[in-house]
């Protein structure tokens, strides 16, 4: 799947509107929009990293991003959602009124909605690189090849997490 490139933001800051709570050690890239409509809120816990141009728009409830979660560039979260501890959302992932469990991983360009069950790939760490995993509709993401390596790399790059 081809994903269009993200344009660099005009501003080197992020924008927050409404009831938005951000922990002191959160890393937020330029061009991020955090919008909480009336009677809604956004909570971002310690150690979260939000990538360039992401949009988090709370409507009709809360969006809660738990400690250590990583949102890559261009992520869109709309409605009500919980992103679990140490979850990783791939670039240009869209969540609409749905949540990701702790440690969950989404592929770049994923679209997850409360109306349709997520489709995730189940891959064991013993599979050789280059094989395409079979997709199956399941309720929660499962083990993803390379997750342990990613977590070690993130720990070495960001030791305070």
Curated annotation (Swiss-Prot):
A GO MF term: structural constituent of carboxysome shell
Source taxon at top rank: Bacteria
Residue positions of motif Encapsulation peptide: 144-161
Region (Disordered): 111-140
Principal location listed in the UniProt entry: other
Keyword Heme: no
Residue ranges with Polar residues bias: 116-137
GO cellular component terms listed in the entry, alphabetical order: carboxysome
Alphabetized InterPro entries for the sequence: Trimer_LpxA-like_sf
Subcellular location: Carboxysome
Keywords per UniProt: Bacterial microcompartment, Carbon dioxide fixation, Carboxysome, Photosynthesis
Residue ranges the record marks as coiled coil: none
Reported uses of this protein in biotechnology and industry: Heterologous expression of 12 carboxysomal genes in E.coli (ccaA, ccmK2, ccmK3, ccmK4, ccmL, ccmM, ccmN, ccmO, ccmP, rbcL, rbcS, rbcX) leads to the formation of bodies that resemble carboxysomes, have densely packed paracrystalline arrays and RuBisCO activity. These structures open the door to generating carboxysomes in plant cells to increase their photosynthesis and productivity, as well as tailoring bacterial microcompartments to specific metabolic needs and molecule delivery.
SS bond list: none
Induction info: Carboxysome size and components vary with growth conditions. When grown in ambient air at medium light (50 uE meter(-2) second(-1)) there are 74 units of this protein per carboxysome, the numbers decrease under low light and high CO(2), and increase under high light (at protein level).
Biological process terms in GO annotation: carbon fixation; photosynthesis
Gene disruption: observed consequences: Cells with a disrupted or mutated protein do not have carboxysomes, instead have less dense inclusions, do not grow in normal air. Targeted disruption do not grow normally in air but have wild-type growth in 3% CO(2), called a high-CO(2) requiring phenotype, HCR. Cells have a single polar aggregate instead of carboxysomes; RuBisCO localizes to polar spots consistent with the polar aggregates.
Stated role: Required for carboxysome formation; the N-terminus interacts with CcmM which itself binds RuBisCO (ribulose bisphosphate carboxylase, rbcL-rbcS), while the C-terminal 18 residues interact with carboxysome shell protein CcmK2. Required for growth in normal air. Beta-carboxysome assembly initiates when soluble RuBisCO is condensed into a liquid matrix in a pre-carboxysome by the RbcS-like domains of probably both CcmM58 and CcmM35. CcmN interacts with the N-terminus of CcmM58, and then recruits the CcmK2 major shell protein via CcmN's encapsulation peptide. Shell formation requires CcmK proteins and CcmO. CcmL caps the otherwise elongated carboxysome. Once fully encapsulated carboxysomes are formed, they migrate within the cell probably via interactions with the cytoskeleton.
Quaternary assembly: Interacts with CcmM via the N-terminus of CcmN. Interacts with CcmK2 via the 18 C-terminal residues.
Written domain comment of the UniProt record: The N-terminus interacts with CcmM, while the 18 C-terminal residues (encapsulation peptide) are required for interaction with the hexameric shell proteins (CcmK2) and are predicted to form a helix. The 2 regions are separated by a linker.
Similarity comment text for this entry: Belongs to the CcmN family.
Name of this protein: Carboxysome assembly protein CcmN
Native organism: Synechococcus elongatus (strain ATCC 33912 / PCC 7942 / FACHB-805)
Gene that produces this protein: ccmN
